[in-house]
């Protein structure tokens, strides 16, 4: 601003640029953690956001000033119907020094699920058992060259009537724990069978949540960047809800706040704690159901605090890539709010 004598701090974070719409509603992780486990397991799962509630629990974090006391905690609920592992992807080191796909082995899939998958693909998916046997032999012959294994999983939104959809989300999940041979045997045993979230995560542990935030549309700089509104005195014909100066006309610097898309961004929330995993919806459903969602009917997670995204939006749940602490067990929950959310 030309009339200022003191500098003002820059507005907005450069760490979340570009502020554009996400390319897909269910993002996949760009990196995966390494877990210390002798038993192989998937490093991620997919769930659907239900809403929020609150509970009372005994604080079990040793460094907390309320350790051992009953505390009030806002929580989020994620419904996690079983997923179906579809295929194995083996990755080896490519000629340019980057991991590349060696081959892809598909297991036995039911006809109903196969039809739903074909609706999501441009070309019709045909599974030739003879070719698949050859691909499995190729994986076994190159076990020493394989860097890691990943699994294609399909969600089952048809089990969640609140979503009003049947087409599954198909994502790739890395396998962790054990060695490559034990991982391959584990994946071959679960292909084509329903996999519960209890087979991936446990109560009390931390997870990372990857998803897309609520969309806000096209917004100005005051809401989008937190720019301070100019004083509305008798000389503000050039506007008050805008930046004082955008710089030279021939090239506007990238760090100057500009109006544009706000929300519907890909974001990752780290170290969200699973307080409870349950199969009994009666323990979480409020009277009348969750507003704008309905009634939980499948296995669900209770997550400490708020999470990103709108209700009914798919979220990717991943093992924590840098955990802040390692909970030893699940906390003791003394009360769960079941009162109606509709007043």
Swiss-Prot record:
Assembly notes: Part of the 50S ribosomal subunit. Forms a cluster with proteins L14 and L24e.
Entry GO terms, CC: cytosolic large ribosomal subunit
GO terms, biological process: translation
Name assigned to this protein: Large ribosomal subunit protein uL3
Protein keywords: Ribonucleoprotein, Ribosomal protein, RNA-binding, rRNA-binding
Signal peptide stretch: none
Region (Disordered): 1-31, 238-262
